[in-house]
Amino acid sequence: SGSMDGDRIVMAQKAVIALAEALEPTQVKLSVKGFKTKGLPRSWEKDYRKSRVKKPCSSLSPILIFNYKDFGQPLHRCREVIGGMRKSFRNVGGYHNIDGASIALMGEELMKRPEKRKVLMVLSDGLPEDTGMNKRQMNADLVDRVLGLEARGVEVFGVGIQTDAVKQFYRWHTVVNDTSDLEKELVDRMSNVLIGGAWDARKAS
């Protein structure tokens, strides 16, 4: 989203690189994606607002998915791409984040993987948002999507970047407020989970 610009996108970059470095020597296959909305044609929003019967939906805007790292791709081959995360978010598309539909897409990709254990970590700096959409409906959609993935065996973790909004949506969550929190709150805990350990609920923010 637009609010991820500045310090928050830098923190996300550092978090991704630190986690990838921690997992590089292991057998864990890591993929890194980003998502935001593509610009919404005004005619679409006008038609939606004018419609007498507003059918429930999770989004109006098309979703852009950025591929920063593929499963099994060595970090040295994609470090530059991850470093360009801020530029890609600034130069392409709109400014909103449709979390529910986006993590559902990532979940479908995970379900195609051969690994028995499937973990989805979501970095977020706030609430789902899209042009013309009901915020309560979008929040409820995200909760439903998370529960749906968990029901299919996917472990879903929320990482709040300078926000505790993740508490509303993710059973397993933590908050990173500054770069000093990265190693303690994210890298150590998530790398432990990904190599087969358990989530330390006592430390969850």
Which residues does each predicted region cover?
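Acidic, glycine-rich A-domain
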Residues: 1-205
